[in-house]
Amino acid sequence: MFRGAKSGQARRCPVSGRRVVYTGSRSRSPSGEEAVDIDIDLVTRARAGDSSAFAELVEQHRRELEVHCYRLLGSAQDAEDAVQETFLAAWQHMPAFEVRASVRTWLYRIATNWCLGALRSARRRPPREVFVPKPPSPAPTSPSEVIWLEPYPDVLLDGLPDEMPGPAARYQAREAISLAFVTALQLLPPRQRVVLVLRDVLGYRAREVASMLDTTEESVTSALRHARANLRHRLPRPADPPPAPGSLAEQAIVERLTMAYETGDVNALVSLLSEDVTISAPLAAGQYAGTAVARPFLETAVFPPGRTYRLIPTRANGQPAFGVYVRDPATGVFHVNGMLVLTLAGDRIRAMTRFDNTSIARFGLPRRLSPGPSAHQEV
């Protein structure tokens, strides 16, 4: 036990296993929020150094904190790391935690400020691979901007607690995890990004956000105004909304896309695309906008002669997604070739985003498939 821990005393974090030193500084929670997540006995034990009580106190918030950090950082791996650092800092400052404060908001405060520090220092992993299309592939219509972007598995979203956003929220939780929304967030300056997520996604009031960021309400209001204007420019709403997740309309698009991909039917694939479609890969040299450019890119870079694909459906960011596999002509084995995430608008595909192989394990997908045709390929 570490009852009455003093400044300079070392404690081992029960979540990460790392040793930390209590500095005596106070990590305050936003003032004025109703503390609805309090278990006073649990908090008291955690403050006294009870590691199992601390783990029980914070682990219930892990999933939602990871989603929060993912929105801010754009990388699922970086989000996991951020939450580990959050729990480490929380354990370090637990003796100074106010017993009747909100544990959830306190953790959000720590996580948000850790992410803000990471964004300001531009700590980004270098690209693991860079795909540069070779001639005769067409030139990209614009460069890639968010090379660190990663997809987020829907299975992790299903584990989120049933928390309603605050009264100031403008976005539904699922809307605020879409690939387009997360991409647009990455293009905002760090403080604008953080303020917009806290205010418009999580629904914290301006005074609460000001307390979390150690700033003024006026500064928060100004940052939010600029963030909303920038987001409107970066994230125009499509004329047609996407079909409901799991609906027959969505399933029909997924089935037709799978058949076109596995049979190498470029014409059938292009018929599914909207006129303003965007095909991109965060680590690629650029993105391809419009069917006039998308068709030759698909014909030359994606479906060259002799290449055969197999797709395994999954879901990412609340959207249809696939593990993509390419057949080895020598063995017939299908090897993983990245992930594909679809953005739908009405009955058309508005964006196709390809990610590298590093996300496969997080989605529980295999790295190879046995030889043999799929249901859409001839025997």
Listing of model-derived features with the role each one plays in the protein:
Residues 44-67, 77, 91:
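A short, charge-rich alpha-helical start-of-domain segment used by transcription regulators
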Residues 206-212, 217-310:
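Solvent-exposed, charged amphipathic helical/linker segments at domain boundaries
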Residues 47-48, 72-76, 85-103, 117-126, ...:
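Sigma70-family region 2
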Residues 108, 118-151, 234-246:
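Short, basic/polar amphipathic helix motif occurring as a linker/hinge flanking DNA-binding modules
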Residues 65, 69, 94, 107, ...:
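Hydrophobic-face residues of short alpha-helical interaction/recognition segments
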Residues 186, 190-194, 198-219:
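Helix-turn-helix DNA-binding module
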Residues 37, 48-51, 148-192, 247-251, ...:
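Amphipathic alpha-helical segment used for protein-protein interaction
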Residues 295-379:
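Low-complexity, glycine/alanine/valine/leucine- and proline-rich hydrophobic stretches
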